[in-house]
Amino acid sequence: MQQALFGGGCFWCVEAVFLQIRGVEKVTSGYAGGHTTHPTYEQVCQGDTQHAEVVLIDFDEQQVTYSQLLDVFFATHDPTTLNRQGNDIGTQYRSVIYYFNEEQKQAAEHTIQTLKDDDLDIVTELSPTPTFYPAEDYHQNYYEKNPSQGYCNFAIPPKLLKLHSKFQHLMKN
């Protein structure tokens, strides 16, 4: 089992996307990249902790590769807006990839360079994996538990439509 750690805006949205991918065994919403130990959602939302909302993805590399997860990540959020995804503004919503090893770093660098070669101004941060703090229980599997919640109903379906149209071959049955 391998792990990936991505931040691409609200973790509810990112989690909802990656739970659809075959080979993804678990997605845990949480916080990483800041200076506060064991931050709360409220602290992260205030913007003082410097943590990003992230998802820790446990995946079977025999079913889905890290590079494929990177492709999904970049296609389902906007990696060209600094500290912002749609109406969500703040450093906690930054686009970030935390890598666990040199192979992940190289794969991310390659993907970012490919996007830059296509004239995209990528602002995604690439850093070694810091301490990951799981978010509170009510944030886990949030969209699955709250599909009609206003924010989820607005923000997540377009991401899932894009996922289904571009990555059908990676979807769970």
Curated annotation (Swiss-Prot):
The keyword Protease does not apply. The active site is at residue 10. Keywords: Oxidoreductase. GO terms for biological process: protein modification process. Signal peptide: none annotated. It catalyses: L-methionyl-[protein] + [thioredoxin]-disulfide + H2O = L-methionyl-(S)-S-oxide-[protein] + [thioredoxin]-dithiol; [thioredoxin]-disulfide + L-methionine + H2O = L-methionine (S)-S-oxide + [thioredoxin]-dithiol. It comes from the Bacteria. NCBIfam families: msrA. Belongs to the MsrA Met sulfoxide reductase family. This is Peptide methionine sulfoxide reductase MsrA. It comes from Acinetobacter baumannii (strain ATCC 17978 / DSM 105126 / CIP 53.77 / LMG 1025 / NCDC KC755 / 5377). The lineage of its organism: Bacteria, Pseudomonadati, Pseudomonadota, Gammaproteobacteria, Moraxellales. The gene is msrA.
